[in-house]
């Protein structure tokens, strides 16, 4: 059996929801307190045992490459000033086996994954979406990517991460139609549906940003016609794969943070900061103070 060694991180999106901040800065470099969102993804991959990572980038994404490259001037400065803890943090982002390829035109997630065909070769691999951060406030939790890799060790089949979402929200996701009940959190899947209307959704089990796929997906993606949004949809290709190979779905029971929109990004930042040793106490005190002020502002005033 071939070991899962490689991961793909699609990072070619334009980040329009975060304009003007993302006009010249990659969305994936926006920080949660003091760490870019893409670094959380890379750390999850490494904790799971992934050995090689390919980041699929686009225009205005050079900052991602710079972040994971050596900065000799900064490292020398930190070393000279004896700032060893900061130097360690900088070193952690450079000692990684990272590769980069550019998606010339954003044609959807399926097309972004297709750019990795030569990198992956004939091996199973993981796709990790940067908008979904998993259990970042729980250091002891088993990484979701690791869970998928363990499933593959048992099934030798593609496995997609899913999570129950409110029924009214299913139109924002790919959704699975499961075959029966889950066995130890693992579903067999009948079909995959991309962004169904709530009345048409086969379940509330939405696909979230972790996929473990067999290399046969690439032949399907090369023939895949554009789907929703006139883009090459990875969900559609997985549904086609499911017709010739079994595809499973792993239900995630941990905490998922969606940093793909402003409010989700803000919630993630607050939750992570409340666990951050350098700021958590000050933030807790501020939130308590702010809560009291907001409650006071709700108290109706009575004029005489």
Swiss-Prot record:
Asked whether the UniProt record includes Transferase among its keywords, one would answer yes
Q: SUPFAM superfamilies from the xrefs?
A: Nucleotide-diphospho-sugar transferases (SSF53448)
Pathway the protein contributes to: Carbohydrate metabolism; nucleotide-sugar metabolism
Keyword annotations:
Nucleotidyltransferase, Transferase
Which Gene3D superfamilies does this chain map to? Spore Coat Polysaccharide Biosynthesis Protein SpsA, Chain A
| EC number annotated for this UniProt entry | 2.7.7.9
Q: Which reaction does it catalyse?
A: alpha-D-glucose 1-phosphate + UTP + H(+) = UDP-alpha-D-glucose + diphosphate
Instruction: Report any one BP term from Gene Ontology.
Output: biosynthetic process
> What Gene Ontology terms describe what this protein does at the molecular function level?
UTP:glucose-1-phosphate uridylyltransferase activity
**Lineage of producing organism:** Bacteria, Bacillati, Bacillota, Bacilli, Lactobacillales
The similarity comment for this entry is: Belongs to the UDPGP type 2 family.
Question: Which InterPro entries does this chain map to?
Answer: GalU_uridylyltTrfase_bac/arc, NTP_transferase_dom, Nucleotide-diphossugar_trans
Which organism encodes this protein? Streptococcus pyogenes serotype M3 (strain ATCC BAA-595 / MGAS315)
Q: What is this protein called?
A: UTP--glucose-1-phosphate uridylyltransferase 1
* Top EC class, one word: transferase
């Amino acid at each position: 059996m071939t070991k899962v060694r490689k991961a793909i991180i699609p990072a070619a999106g334009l980040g329009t929801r975060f304009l003007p901040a993302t006009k010249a800065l990659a969305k994936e470099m926006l920080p949660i307190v003091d760490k870019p969102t893409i670094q959380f993804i890379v750390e999850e991959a490494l904790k799971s045992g992934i050995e090689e990572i390919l980041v699929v980038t686009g225009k205005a994404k050079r900052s991602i490459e710079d972040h994971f490259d050596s900065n000799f001037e900064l490292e020398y400065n930190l070393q000279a000033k004896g700032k060893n803890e900061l130097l360690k943090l900088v070193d952690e982002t450079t000692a990684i086996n990272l590769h980069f390829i550019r998606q010339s035109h954003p044609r959807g997630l399926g097309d972004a994954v297709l750019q990795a065909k030569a990198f992956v070769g004939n091996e199973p691999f993981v796709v990790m979406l940067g908008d979904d951060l998993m259990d970042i406030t729980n250091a002891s939790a088993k990484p979701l990517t690791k869970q998928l890799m363990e499933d593959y060790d048992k099934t030798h089949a593609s496995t997609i991460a899913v999570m129950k979402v409110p029924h009214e929200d299913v139109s924002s996701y790919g959704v699975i139609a499961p075959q029966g009940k889950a066995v130890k959190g693992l579903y067999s899947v009948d079909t995959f549906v991309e962004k169904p209307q709530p009345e048409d959704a086969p379940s509330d089990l939405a696909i979230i940003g972790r996929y473990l796929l067999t290399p046969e997906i690439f032949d399907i993606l090369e023939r895949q016609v554009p789907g929703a949004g006139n883009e090459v949809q990875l969900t559609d290709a997985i549904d086609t794969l499911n017709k010739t190979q079994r595809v499973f779905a792993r239900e995630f029971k941990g905490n998922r943070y969606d940093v793909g929109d402003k409010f989700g990004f803000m919630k993630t930042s607050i939750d992570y900061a409340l666990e951050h040793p350098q700021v958590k106490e000050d933030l807790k005190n501020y939130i308590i103070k702010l809560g009291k002020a907001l409650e006071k502002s709700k108290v109706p005033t009575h004029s005489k």
